[in-house]
């Protein structure tokens, strides 16, 4: 690897050399890595950066010289699988450094979030399990005496050995990215509200008292996430997203707030440290409070389809960065969601005659063509609001809400004649789930009997069947409109994602992301054993607002979204008052 390269452009930190800053600023920004690997978690000291990287089949931890002069994968850590065998940890996440910087706190990333935490020597050797605790995310205190970790909606505190575990705080959503202040007195963490599509920064004292949200009425507080203290404890650096004025682009920026007040609240708004066009996140502060390290991201999502004759994935529309692409019934038009930006577009099947249909601060997702090709239904994801379905003319116009009823709405399904629209809920509470059908003639919405507790509805093309999922995403239910009866169709070994009916309404296909190799599976009406029809293999899939997406092209081939984003480590010089 070569040396670091300066990143050109204006940042809020630009100033006259030698002038004392009145507020935190970023000076030089330099690119440290140039390897092209996807990156997630990052921890750093002043000489080394440890970053979780995605190769073709695994998540590994790379150690990178802070000046970009060298890069090496850390050894595979041995850990006891049983009393008589040894194994190697895979899919690693770098979560933190020990006080003496000789050990890494790591976990194995799993979709369930029930990860074990391990202390592993940087120089190689046997890893040590930290008690029997499990969770999503964890962090050591600066003195190494305690471990804080999040599991579901609960923040826990334990000693360094993972013992003496006790509940510290119970939040209203899932908790992650906990970080001790350098003096160990308080812990800041992120709470995610999945239904509202928001995140929020919180603080709690080490003894569990004085829990409160940060940032007051700041406009971007609903996207704030994942912070890191400067080593001197004077500032807390975090990430939050904002729309670029007069564009469809959303940029994740780094911000700073002072920690001078004991209650963690500040009269002034956070100070903007980066302004784009690149997004920055996963920030880690150096020991001297003079440098930050972060992952810089330039998102690019390529919709591809599987070409069986060539046994490879090929672009659907070359040069287009998008997700959630759907063809009109006649195959002549497409609708899709732009990446970045999350806006709804319509275009010819070859990408020409492109027309932007939505604007504003919200994201669009899951567009669905009406049978006559005149209208597109889509879901609007606005932070702090329930997800709602809208209809918009394919030629452009003003979006119209599908229903004024409260609660979330998602997964629009048109009836074959276009006179009705079926949709479901997005809600983690099974008691609040149901499936409804809107009649455009009467403007009445009715709940499908027996659909309580079900979501992700899929109407068969002939109108006879409805497939829907139980909250565990593995139990697939089937409703027969002719017999007006529900029955359990299958219980999958992995999660059922993005189900799609066959054109003849006799089979349902779904994306299996968990059961071994990612694959497309098919189950026929009247049968209960899914069969594998396509292995996705090592395709690097883009993670969008609703996870990884799949669908079917006009020719029946399978479509996926390949992640072609650039993710590299950057060093940002920090200038403090």
Predicted regions and their residues:
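Conserved beta-propeller blade repeats
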Residues: 36-52, 78-108, 129-150, 155, ...
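Short loop/turn segments that connect beta-strands within beta-propeller blades
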Residues: 65-69, 121-125, 159-163, 205-209, ...
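Ankyrin-repeat and related helical/solenoid repeat scaffolds used for protein-protein interactions
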Residues: 502-538
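Terminal hydrophobic membrane-targeting helix
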Residues: 30-31, 39-43, 49-65, 69-75
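Predominantly a core beta-strand signature of beta-propeller blades
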Residues: 28-29, 69-72, 125-128, 163-167, ...
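Cytosolic linker/terminal segments flanking nucleotidyl-cyclase catalytic modules
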Residues: 1-30, 37
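Residue-level "micro-hotspots" composed of small/polar
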Residues: 259, 263, 536-541, 562, ...
């Amino acid at each position: 690897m070569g040396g670091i390269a300066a990143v050109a452009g204006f940042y809020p930190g630009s100033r006259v050399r030698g002038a004392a800053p009145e507020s935190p600023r970023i000076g030089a920004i330099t690119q440290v890595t140039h390897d092209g690997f996807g990156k997630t978690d990052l921890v750093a000291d002043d000489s080394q950066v440890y970053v979780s990287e995605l190769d073709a089949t695994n998540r590994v931890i790379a150690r990178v010289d802070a000046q970009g002069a060298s890069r090496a994968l850390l050894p595979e850590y041995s850990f006891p699988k049983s009393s008589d065998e040894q194994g190697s940890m895979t899919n690693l996440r770098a979560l933190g450094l020990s006080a003496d910087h000789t050990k890494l706190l790591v976990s194995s990333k799993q979709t369930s979030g029930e990860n074990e935490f391990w202390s592993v020597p940087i120089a190689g050797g046997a890893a040590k399990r930290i008690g029997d605790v499990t969770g999503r995310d964890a962090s050591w205190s600066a003195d190494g005496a305690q471990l804080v970790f999040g599991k579901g909606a609960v923040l826990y505190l334990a000693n360094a050995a993972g013992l003496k575990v006790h509940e510290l705080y119970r939040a209203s959503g899932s908790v992650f990215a906990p970080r001790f202040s350098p003096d160990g007195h308080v812990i800041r963490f992120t709470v995610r509200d999945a239904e509202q599509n928001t995140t929020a920064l919180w603080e709690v004292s080490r003894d569990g008292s004085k829990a409160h949200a940060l940032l007051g009425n700041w406009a971007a507080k609903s996207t704030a996430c994942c912070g890191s203290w400067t080593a001197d404890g004077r500032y807390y650096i975090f990430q939050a997203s904002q729309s670029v004025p007069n564009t469809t682009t959303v940029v994740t920026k780094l911000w700073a707030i002072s920690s001078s007040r004991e209650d963690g609240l500040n009269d002034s708004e956070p100070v903007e440290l980066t302004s784009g066009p690149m997004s920055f996140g996963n920030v880690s502060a150096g020991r001297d409070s003079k440098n930050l390290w972060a992952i810089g991201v330039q998102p690019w999502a390529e919709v591809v389809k599987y070409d069986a004759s060539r046994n490879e994935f090929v672009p659907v529309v070359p040069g287009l960065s998008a997700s959630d692409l759907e063809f009109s019934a006649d195959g002549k038009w497409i609708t899709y969601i732009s990446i970045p930006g999350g806006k709804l577009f319509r275009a010819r099947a070859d990408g020409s005659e492109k027309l932007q249909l939505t604007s504003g601060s919200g994201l669009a997702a899951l567009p669905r063509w009406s049978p006559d090709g005149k209208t597109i239904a889509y879901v609007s994801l606005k932070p702090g609001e329930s997800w709602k379905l809208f209809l918009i003319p394919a030629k452009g116009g003003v979006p119209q809400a599908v229903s004024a009823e409260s609660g979330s709405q998602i997964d629009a399904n048109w009836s074959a004649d276009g006179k009705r629209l079926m949709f479901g809920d997005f809600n983690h509470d099974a008691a609040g789930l149901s499936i409804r059908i809107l009649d455009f003639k009467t403007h009445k919405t009715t709940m499908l009997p027996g659909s309580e507790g079900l979501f992700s509805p899929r109407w068969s093309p002939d109108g006879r069947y409805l497939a829907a999922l139980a909250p565990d995403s593995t139990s697939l239910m089937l409703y027969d409109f002719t017999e007006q009866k529900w029955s359990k169709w299958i219980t999958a070994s992995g999660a059922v994602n993005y189900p799609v009916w066959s054109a003849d309404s006799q089979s349902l296909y779904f994306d299996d992301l968990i059961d071994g190799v990612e694959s497309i599976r098919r189950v026929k009406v009247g049968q209960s054993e899914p069969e594998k029809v396509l292995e996705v293999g090592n395709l690097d899939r883009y993670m969008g607002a609703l996870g990884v997406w799949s669908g079917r092209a006009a020719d029946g081939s399978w479509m996926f979204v390949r992640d072609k984003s650039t993710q590299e480590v950057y060093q940002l010089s920090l200038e403090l008052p």
